[in-house]
C-alpha cells in the first residue's frame, strides 16, 4: 500500500506541475460489505488522505469522488479538509445533498442527477430542464456543481447533457 500511495502522490504532483488545476480522486473502500470501520481506518483512510494531501500540497484542487454504493458516509467526514469538491452516488448510497453539505462542512458538492436512470438516461429535454431547475431550486446555486452521481454511460445522449448545462446556466 505504501508503494502504491507513493506513486499516486507523485502522479498527482506531476499532474499539477504539468498544468492541470485539479485531480478527480476516486476513493474506494467505504462499502460496508467489504471493510469494517476498523479495517477502513487502517487500510483505506490513511492512504486516501496522503494522496489528497499531496494534491493540495502541489497547489491543486481535489475533487473527491466517493465511489460505489452501500457506503458508510460517516467514514469520510474527516476527508473534508483535503477536498475542495465532493461527489458521491446520491441516488445509489442513498445520502442526499443536504446531508452531504452538513457532513462535509459546507464544501462544494458536485452532483444532483442520477447517471444510470432518470432524466439523463430516458427523459425528454423538457424533463431534463425540469429536473435541473428542481435540483438548483432545492439545493441552491452556492456550493453546487451540477453533475451526475458517477460516470455517464458511453452511449449517453449528449444532447441531454447539453440541455442540462443550458438550463443550469439560465437559472
Sequence positions of predicted segments:
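Active-site loop segments of alpha/beta catalytic cores
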Residues: 1-171
